[in-house]
Amino acid sequence: MSDIKNITKLQIEDKGKKYSLYSLKKLSQELGKDVTRLPYSIRVLLENQLRNIDGYKVKEDDMHKVLDWDAKASSRPEIPHMPARVVMQDFTGVPAVVDLAAMRKAIKDAGGDADKINPLVDTAMVIDHSVQVDFYGTKTALAQNVAKEFERNGERYSLLKWAQKAFDDFIVVPPGMGIIHQVNLEYLAKDALVKNINGEDVIYPDTLVGTDSHTTMINGVGAVGWGVGGIEAEAVMLGQPYYMVLPDVVGVKFTGKLKTGVTATDLVLKVTEVLRKHGVVGKFVEYYGEGLESLSLPDRATIANMTPEYGATIGFFPVDEVTLDFFNNTNRSELVDAAREMYKEQLLFRENPAEEPEYSNIVEIDLSEVESNLAGPKRPQDRVAFHDMKKAFAEALVHEQGLHGFGLTDEQLQKSAEVKGLNERITHGSVAIAAITSCTNTSNPSLLLGAGLLAKKANEKGLKVKPFVKTSLAPGSQVVTQYLEKANLLPELENLGFNLVGYGCTTCIGNSGPLDEPVVEAINEADLIVASVSSGNRNFEGRINPHIKANYLASPIHVVAYALAGTVDFDPVEDAIGKDAEGNDVYLADIWPTTEEIAAIQSHVINSDMFKKAYATVLDGTEEWQKLKAPEGKLYEFDSSSTYIQCPNFFEKFAEGNDDLDIKGARTLLMLGDSVTTDHISPAGAIPEEYPAGQYLKSHGVEKKDFNSYGSRRGNHEVMMRGTFANIRIRNLLLDNVEGGFTKYHLDGSQQYVFDAAMKYKEKGIPLVILAGKEYGTGSSRDWAAKGTFLLGVKAVIAESYERIHRSNLVGMGVLPLEYVNGQNAKTLGLDGTEMFNIKNLNNIKPRQIVIVEAVHPKTAHTTTFEALARLDADVDVDYLKNGGILQTVLKDIMGDKKESKSTQSTTSKGCGSADTSSETSCPFAKIANFFKKLFK
């Protein structure tokens, strides 16, 4: 043990138990450095470095880098962060389990111990991303959707049930139990973690990474955690540090108090707007100020949940008494007293509201000025005041086509269509989906109870939801339905069609299910811009439903209100929402619940026993899960005929070095604009029959009704590489006025599917690049957006800016992210995407190095030369690029192969199946197996 660890070590005692810790208070005293000047979130990183010093992965110098954090530094060092936990959801978790299973097979084939591949940190997977809203509006909807879910996903779930038994320190929360971040908040997270190390119980703060961008929700309880790609999570699971550059920390000072009727949803949409404008991408955000005193823990969690939408790495609330009360009230009181003492000894307990650590920048938000809000129609940061919605939607209809509008003509504005069988006409703005969904809001009891109260008052007035609105209630945990039932508000919601459809992500991630066919026909007949209103966290175009172009985020209370109105072309102050039994106009003000009404109900319907009951059997799962058959043993047998799960091919040519990283004669696969999301790059929703992924499934005997979604097939790289850049709403600027997954094949000028063109380039040995604008890769922490890019043969992306997780994922797959400098972009440089690109001198590249890019016009030979910043932000990023990715680097470490090998991309697709792995060509992992044979000799 290092001297500094010995010096700072002390013990605390609680309820007769002794706990060791490494004290930041003692560290501060011994070194004469003021730890309290550091933001709380940086202090958590400091404790992590101090506790994990081993002279190998974490060195004392790494701890000093954090201790010396400077709020105004122009450059920052890299540290090896050691998260205590990993959380995963099934869309990102299935491919991770497939990777681990394939690695085990490789070791076994080499005569080694398959247990060498096993999680070394606690890992939990919550299955929540697969349930779809096929059935709604009835008491049987839940059972029908669950049955359909298991019918579609039996093979995937069997794999995960196998993993539940096959891996140590790996738990699976079965489907139907809740949403990952709400389950994490209510059950998995602890007020403090305890681990027995060399016979001593060491107590320390919770830290984690998760394979979902909204992992940040846990920042609401003072846990430092954020979303990463699946490949990064796998590395952490296998005991690797998470290498990160110390961030700037933006302090957000809350003052005042929310007005009555204004909710946490209204606040977080305001915060998202403000921080997007301020610019916090890649930075920590930390909340402080006297305004925190009035925010409940669920309010804080709602704000932390949407951290990816405002672009930060974390949105952190320090631990205080509100935090510990939450753990007490949710059946996790065992360690509360010990945790309090630990946090105080670590200088991590917020006691003085006036305390103001040093921040890189400060943003002030007066809570009393926040008003009722929505966000849309296409981005979470585009806030619209509730009272301005009618005007804002009208403006969006005629605003030029793009991020803010739909570009309708006067003639198009007049269109409407009849919905057959309903005696109703719909027009622009008609609400086709109203969904109470997402952990963002369903984790907050005040919002759900508010929606129930609005429903109750609407029922008392005799109001009805418009029949063309698809309504749904999908809570993030079973606690929600317990307290709604206890408050007698669940029947009120059901009476308006908000029946329980599932405990999962559903509409929020695009699993809204099909609209009724007569509604679809009416939309298509008049080419209508219809709307969705959901309590989710993302509203990117094409995400919620392919037939809905205007998507608004709102509180559950607003969701019920717009379901009643039937349109977003509605003034909530001036327009009546309906008529009562006597024919009198009813206005929203007549039925809107007050903050006081909600609080009065909340105080007597929620208790810790609800959480105890909901989570007592959470790992047992539903009857369907218990009946599900799963393989036994340490090894998973891949089935070469499966269209869901295949042995991944990321390690083909793994053992071969690539001595030349330079990119020569690359062509542009896509030329994209601003705010291209990971949904655009790798959609999670429906698979169109005519697209390459649909054709692949048909060729393997899968009927259209059984296609399921892209997200559910992430265990099969053949489907996913065909689904890359296959979003039906993506716009490739290489083509004029074309929407969807198409590109121009430069060698003959033809329009082709992106996948088909990429494979032709691959056959000819032509490397590829992508040109993009600002905020490239915004949205979900979808590692398949990078994996698919890699498999298509893309060597580099050149963009104006990147979202944090996607940049990291690209590097993790051996794809070079480059950034324009000096305010340049494709337009200012005169690039049209037809050029051939040369990017040289990459073999000795350094972090954040300026590289020279040559763009040669193929007809005139005119060359445009410009500089670009290599977004390899740390030394380890360079290693990943040279080795071809994170997992390749990890495997080289495991196998003791110290020589540098260069990235080699391949799109040759061979599954392991049951083929003879004695032949290196029969399985991509056979090459790895040969390394293991040397290792285990």
UniProtKB/Swiss-Prot annotation:
Belongs to the aconitase/IPM isomerase family. CDD domains: AcnA_IRP (cd01586), AcnA_IRP_Swivel (cd01580). GO terms for molecular function: 2-methylisocitrate dehydratase activity; 4 iron, 4 sulfur cluster binding; aconitate hydratase activity; metal ion binding; RNA binding. The lineage of its organism: Bacteria, Pseudomonadati, Pseudomonadota, Gammaproteobacteria, Thiotrichales. Residues 898-921 are annotated as: Disordered. It comes from the Bacteria. This is Aconitate hydratase A. Its cofactor is [4Fe-4S] cluster. It holds the Pfam family Aconitase.
